[in-house]
Amino acid sequence: MTSGATPRPLSFPGLLIWRVGGDLFFASIAHFDEGLKAALAANRPAAKHVLVDADSVNFIDTSACDAALNSIKELQGQGITFAFARVRDDVREWMRLGGIEAVVGPTNFYERVTDGVRAWQQRGILEVPPRNRG
């Protein structure tokens, strides 16, 4: 499993678009946690919002749900907000059962990454940088 920041043609100050590169299970969740925290530490200006691109996640087990939930809560405690995009229905159901959906908020799940970015812009969470306007 690989994870990383998803290259995007548009950039938004304070936003990290994080792409999960595979299934999440007991043996891979540490890579997710460590990679996400490293990407947040390297992101400048400092990201306060994380949009997780979960298109490559076909499976998540209960141990991964528990570990991801703990990581999300820890980072939320540091003022970081989360949303998810491109989550498959069965993975979303496991996330709901595992408590991730309740902590992130059911309205913070989007069909596409661009839907999440637009929603956060409309709610005033993200600003469109001047170079990306018009």
Positions of the model-derived regions?
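Structured cytosolic domains appended to multi-pass membrane proteins
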Residues: 2-134
